[in-house]
A protein has these predicted regions:
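General nucleic-acid-binding
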Residues: 1-19
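The DNA-recognition helices of helix-turn-helix-type DNA-binding domains
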Residues: 52, 76-77, 91
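Short coil turns linking two alpha-helices in DNA-binding domains
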Residues: 65-68, 76, 80
Length: 114
């Protein structure tokens, strides 16, 4: 779904001033990635980058070119896991948060057994 510029600006502005919102963006991006919602994960990452460190500072911190970072989180981005993790790690450090994975059982009717 295409977002209007004003909505993106609103998200970016809120991320700049709200630590809990920044943490939630990172959490949602990671959850989207784990759920296979890669377009959503990239979009959330882009919002988080724009609302926190910005692409120039992220490029310096991760030693990845700005244009590569922008492509990574763009609509057709296909970041390597190594680069994605490097970006997440830096965003977490900048936001002062860390992540952990919690494994939970699925509903019995939603998975197949061998």
């Amino acid at each position: 779904m295409a977002l209007t510029r004003s909505f993106r600006e609103t998200v970016t502005e809120r991320a700049r001033h709200d630590a809990a919102f920044r943490a939630a963006l990172i959490e949602e991006a990671l959850q989207a990635m784990l759920d296979g919602e890669l377009d959503e994960a990239r979009s959330l990452m882009r919002d988080c980058i724009n609302g926190t460190v910005g692409f120039d500072a992220l490029s310096t911190a991760t030693q990845l070119p700005v244009k590569s970072l922008m492509r990574m989180v763009g609509p057709r981005g296909n970041p390597t896991l190594q680069h994605f993790v490097r970006v997440i790690h830096h965003l977490q450090a900048a936001a002062g948060v860390s992540s952990r994975v919690e494994v939970a059982p699925t509903d019995p009717g939603t998975h197949e057994t061998p």
